[in-house]
């Protein structure tokens, strides 16, 4: 019976199309899944989409669509992207799948019935893009510590998960399982986070309805992280009659995630599993970001690289190779067109492509395209053979540590050694001496056999290139398995045939100029597209008024909020504004400012705010909008 291996990616949030950073995670998971299949494992590879939440509901409403209609379109694009990227997932889960929703409700009910979930009132800060709740002390400059975007103050009745009860258990688990969180730096971050004190987690929302209903209280929907994290077990049939896959594959061997969501996967998710009495995943690996000059790629910032465009231009294997080779998997890396092109030219065109081309060309030229029989091996041959024979074990060791870059570096040592072997043995010189024909045959056989090893070992990283290599070398399927990685199995008499160049060289200067021009055009188009025009009728719905600040005081418990009493004509209003880091209460009194007069009141830290003041912000600065002449409070602005 085969050993099992269960690997997952995060399920991606389909608020917009995905970028190369998402492909990075998924290509890495795919390479690992393919490698484990190659080495004889029964693999389960899961990916999918996390489709609920307030942000999706807002975007869909803006586009005049239902949330389900909106995500359906994005999901089709994502599935097409994974097809383009040669992703060999075994199951694609959507959190809108009926079976997932049903199991999530069962999980919520179980946790509620055993006392791990209870009803209460939440008051704090909420980041809509991240779907995350934060305390005042966790904010960085008053913004979300994960994404750096503004947060909203919310007061809401709902359900809480007793996360605080699991802090000591989590720390003990980390101590007993030192490899659970990788790399080591992420582990230390999580230990420090827990030691600072865990607060109970708000796990339902009632201010929007795009989500899975709390089964016994349907005006609440289940908080997106409880919903999303459960996918790793709902996809296997947990809590159903058909739970064979769950029994077979759980616990997961590795959750691959971006470093920004390690906290959810190593604190919230394990605590949930402990509460459910289930074993924890064996490893959570939080990889770094692919960064463009100027910062992390982000759909909301618009500074993303479209993987489909890259594949159209350079081919899928070149992109997969670059992603896995360029940056050590746990670290951040910078994506640039120049680095990509140089990597293609150097490693793929010059090293691998030339090795195949030279080998096949020489076999055709000197042996009419028929692989010769090797004769006795000399010391220089044994050196090449040893590099090849020792390679599978080294690659396996690196892959088990998720060190994709190091695994590829090892494979390229054989590529380099084989190229050097050509220069050392000089087949073109041997061909001139008939008495050296046997020696020439040995050299060319060793090169072809080295290429067979290379093709097998790069297949998890670059699924298409080995097929082209094997076709040119005449290698049959039985000699492309892990078990066939024994030097000397390639059959003499095999017919080779030159094919297309694996990776044509790219003119770096011309290509960069072309890409720069294309980027400029795209940026111009994007800027034009991003103006979200409204009609005069839309604007006329907003009532702006001049208001005079009569009183101002800090809101207790917040360094950001100021409560102000305003005179708006004959009316006195109260507004709460997040301007405490830029203005003292004293300097506000007497100012005439602009407010949104007809905004629906809402509570901030339990204090009702009857409108919203207007301010300009830029690069950490803020300035209130005021009037340049003395005018009566209550005056309308049009």
UniProtKB/Swiss-Prot annotation:
Q: Which domain of life is it from?
A: Bacteria
- Keyword line: Aminoacyl-tRNA synthetase, ATP-binding, Cytoplasm, Ligase, Metal-binding, Nucleotide-binding, Protein biosynthesis, RNA-binding, tRNA-binding, Zinc
Report any one BP term from Gene Ontology.
methionyl-tRNA aminoacylation
Sequence motif 'HIGH' region, location on chain: 12-22
Which amino acids does the record list as binding Zn(2+)? 127, 130, 144, 147
InterPro entries in the record: aa-tRNA-synth_I_CS, Anticodon_Met, Met-tRNA-synth_bsu_C, Met-tRNA_synth, Met-tRNA_synth_2, Methionyl/Leucyl_tRNA_Synth, MetRS_core, NA-bd_OB-fold
Q: What class of enzyme is it?
A: ligase
Q: Which family does it belong to?
A: Belongs to the class-I aminoacyl-tRNA synthetase family. MetG type 2A subfamily.
**Can you say what this protein is called?**
Methionine--tRNA ligase
Q: Which organism is it from?
A: Caldanaerobacter subterraneus subsp. tengcongensis (strain DSM 15242 / JCM 11007 / NBRC 100824 / MB4)
Q: What is the lineage of its organism?
A: Bacteria, Bacillati, Bacillota, Clostridia, Thermoanaerobacterales
Point out the gene that encodes the protein.
metG
């Amino acid at each position: 019976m085969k050993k099992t291996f269960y690997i997952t990616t995060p399920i991606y949030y389909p608020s917009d199309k995905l970028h190369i950073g998402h492909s990075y995670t998924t290509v890495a998971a795919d390479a690992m899944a393919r490698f484990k299949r190659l080495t004889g494992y029964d693999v389960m590879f899961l990916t999918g989409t996390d489709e609920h939440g307030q942000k999706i509901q807002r975007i869909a409403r803006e586009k005049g669509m239902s949330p389900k209609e909106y995500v359906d379109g994005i999901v089709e694009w994502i599935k097409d992207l994974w097809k383009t990227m040669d992703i060999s997932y075994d199951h694609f889960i959507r959190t809108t799948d009926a079976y997932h929703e049903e199991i999530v409700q069962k999980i919520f009910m179980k946790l509620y019935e055993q006392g791990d979930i209870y009803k209460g009132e939440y008051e704090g800060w909420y980041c809509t893009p991240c779907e995350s709740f934060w305390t005042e002390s966790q904010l960085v400059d008053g913004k979300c510590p994960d994404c750096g975007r503004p947060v909203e103050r919310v007061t809401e009745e709902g359900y809480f998960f007793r996360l605080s009860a699991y802090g000591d258990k989590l720390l003990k688990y980390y101590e007993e399982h030192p490899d659970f969180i990788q790399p080591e730096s992420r582990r230390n971050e999580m230990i420090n986070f827990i030691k600072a004190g865990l607060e109970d987690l708000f796990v339902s929302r009632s201010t929007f309805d795009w989500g899975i209903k709390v089964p016994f209280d349907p005006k609440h929907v289940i908080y997106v992280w409880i919903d999303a994290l459960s996918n790793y077990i709902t996809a296997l049939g947990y809590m159903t009659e058909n739970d064979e896959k769950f029994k077979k594959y759980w616990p997961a061997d590795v959750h691959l995630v971006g470093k920004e969501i390690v906290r959810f996967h190593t604190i919230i998710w394990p605590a949930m599993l402990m509460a459910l009495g289930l074993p924890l995943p064996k490893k959570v690996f939080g990889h770094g970001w692919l960064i463009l000059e100027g910062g992390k790629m982000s759909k909301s910032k618009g500074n993303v690289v479209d993987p489909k465009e890259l594949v159209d231009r350079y081919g899928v294997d070149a992109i997969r190779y670059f992603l896995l080779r360029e940056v050590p998997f746990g670290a951040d890396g910078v994506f640039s067109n120049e680095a990509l092109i140089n990597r293609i030219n150097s490693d793929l065109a010059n090293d691998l492509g030339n090795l195949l081309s030279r080998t096949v060309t020489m076999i055709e030229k000197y042996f009419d395209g028929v692989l010769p029989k090797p004769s006795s091996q000399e010391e220089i041959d044994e050196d090449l053979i040893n590099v090849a024979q020792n390679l599978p074990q080294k690659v396996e060791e690196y892959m088990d540590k998720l060190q994709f870059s190091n695994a590829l570096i090892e494979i390229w040592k054989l590529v380099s050694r084989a190229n050097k072997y050509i220069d050392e043995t000089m087949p073109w010189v041997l061909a001139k001496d008939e008495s050296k024909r046997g020696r020439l045959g040995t050299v060319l056989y060793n090169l072809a056999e080295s290429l067979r090893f290379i093709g097998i070992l790069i297949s998890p990283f670059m699924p298409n290139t080995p097929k082209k290599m094997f076709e040119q070398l005449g290698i049959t399927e039985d000699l492309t398995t892990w078990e066939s990685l024994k030097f000397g199995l390639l059959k003499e008499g095999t017919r080779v045939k030159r094919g297309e160049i694996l990776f044509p060289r790219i003119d770096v200067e011309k290509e960069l100029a072309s890409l720069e021009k294309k980027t400029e055009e795209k940026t111009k188009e994007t800027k034009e597209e991003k103006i979200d025009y409204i009609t005069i009728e839309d604007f006329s719905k907003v009532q702006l008024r001049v208001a005079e600040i009569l009183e101002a005081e800090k809101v207790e418990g917040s360094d950001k909020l100021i409560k102000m009493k305003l005179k708006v004509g004959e009316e006195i209003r109260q507004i709460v504004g997040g301007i405490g880091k830029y203005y003292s209460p004293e300097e506000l009194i007497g100012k005439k400012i602009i407010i949104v007069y007809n905004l629906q009141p809402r509570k901030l830290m339990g204090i009702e705010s009857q409108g919203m003041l207007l301010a300009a912000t830029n690069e950490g600065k803020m300035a209130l909008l005021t009037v340049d002449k003395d005018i009566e409070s209550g005056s309308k602005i049009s």
